[in-house]
Amino acid sequence: QLMTSTDIPLEDIYQVVYKMTLEEFERIYDSKESNGNKFIQWITQKDTSILDFMLLAKTNEYIRLKRNSRWYYPSMKIGARMTIEEVAEKALSVNEPKLRDRYLLQAIRALFSLGRYQECINLWDSEVVQLPKDNLMRQLIHPYIAGAEFRVKRSEKAITYFAELGD
C-alpha cells in the first residue's frame, strides 16, 4: 500500500503477490484486465513499473522452483518467457529508484541460482550495504550473501554473516 494507494485492499495485493501463478499474471500482463482487483487495476493503469517488476519476480520464482526440482536437467524447457540468466540481466539493468532494492533481491536470487556467488557478493558490497539495516530487501538478501561467502570459501566472513542472522 505504501507504494500504491491506501484505497487498495491488502487482500487484493496479497492475492496478486503471493497467490497468483506466473501463468495467471502473464495473462493479466498481456491483457491489462484487472478482473476487479484494485491492485491489478493500479499497476496496469497508474504504475506499470510495478507491473513489469512483478512479472520479472514471478518469472524468477517460477524458474528457480523448476531448477530446484529433483527432476530438472539443464536442457529441459521450463516454459517461461525468459531464462534465469535473462532475469538476472534484466534485474541488474533496471534503474527504477523506488524499486531498486526489490530488483537487487531478484538479481541476487537469480545469480545465486546460477552459482555466480562472487557477483552476489559484489552487489552486496557495492549497493545493498548502502540500504538501511531495517530495509526488508536487505534483510532478505543477507542470507544469500552468507551462503555466497561460504561457497567462495570465505568461511570467516560467512560465519560472521550467519551469526548476524542468528543462524
Please place each PLM-identified region on the residue numbering.
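Extracytoplasmic/secretory-pathway proteins
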Residues: Q1-R109, S113-D167
